[in-house]
Amino acid sequence: MKKLMLWLCAVMLATSASAREYEASQFGAKGDGVTLDTVAIQKTIDAAAKDGGTVIFKPGTYLSGSIFVKSGVTLKLDKGVTILGSQRLKDYPVMPTRIAGIEMRWPAALVNVYEQRNATVIGEGTIDGDGKIFWDSYWTLRKSYEPRGLRWASDYDAQRPRLIQVFNSTGVKVGGGLLLRRSGFWTLHICYSTDVTVDGVVIRNNEGGLGPSTDGIDIDSSKKVLVQHADIDVNDDALCLKAGRDSDGLRVARSTEDVVIRDSIVRSAAAGVTFGSETSGGFRNIEAYNITTLKGVPVGILFKSAHTRGGFGENLRLHDFTMIDTPVVLRITMNWNPSYSYARIPPEIKDYPDYWKVLSTPVPKEQGMARFHDVRIWNIKAKGASTAFEVDGYTQAPLERFALEGLDIEAQKGGHIHDAANWTFSNVQLKLGTPIALEEGHSVQGLPAASVQTGRRVQPVDPSKKSFEEQDKS
């Protein structure tokens, strides 16, 4: 009995120690929105890391550059607490990471879980990137680059901090009602990580302007990821699967696998659920369901790649989507946004960063074609759409074995399906103003005869002809 009591006491002491709270003001944080609190917050995190404690804050606004959450630490932001990102790029240290599909050095995020285990970022508080200064610098650079044939370099040369980075880590949790707003670049980037849960985040990036490249949640060459209860309003892809770009992505060859995305709403974005355009490492065993997209989302489900990306997608399951006034229900493009996707260094430019060379490294044609197959899409309800389908695969590597079931779509136009092999439709209700254009009717089975027209190929619109703001949503 005495031994049992001693053991119970030891367990209670260990539990108490592991649950110890560390309050940031005790380490010098002011929370006045003016004083730079980076060092004080990091000291608090480092102290908590010694025994797996929780970092807490008094209500206030804590101006900060990059902070790094350590293994075993919970960063808890209660209601009334805001971590406000510094507008000085120098407050975000440059470090190795992956950006838009290539490994390179880039400013750290505002909140980082970098090569850690069992770290948590939760609470009903706010992480605010205050990103407009970075958005404006991007647009200035891009408008000078575009006429010089350097659209592809804009996103890499205009360095901007992400809001949260989970990099090469495992056992990470983010959520609990967090408000993530005004990110300078991507909002929540999960890269090279395993066993990550995002549960309960509100993302608002269209405040005070339209933030370019302000993706919602990017799952990048990672495995065993759950995203649920997300409420997203951004100016690029909302819920996005990525796996590397072109030669560098093919070199790394890390897939995104075993991902579940569910019970979320997308209010404004370039697309609701997106695969790509960074497809090089491939996607396997992805499921997304109970997703709602609204009028501010041009595309409900988007697959995008390019002739130099390569990669694959297999066993992808998308179901129980509700699309309300979302213009395009399903878009698949294997030649997405050419001015961004294909890096060509003008011959008159002799001095350029090393990553330009990485971006412009040629990829053999056969290796560059992404191959999507064994995709199941079912229980999609779309009302008020402009176009049902915009599907453009490769003639040499068609989109294979797509099964679409239980579709209930009302759209002004049927759109088109090109370079598809062994597509089957079943139990579909289509109310279309114009039929779906097919090149080869025998490759697509099960569509009502009245909803199909076989004929000449429909040429997709070149997004480079659109405004800068519209290009990224094409």
Stretches with model-predicted labels:
Residues M1-L4:
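Positively charged n-region of N-terminal signal peptides that target proteins for export
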Residues W7-A14:
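Bacterial N-terminal signal peptides
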Residues A19-S474:
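Extracellular/periplasmic carbohydrate-active domains that bind, remodel
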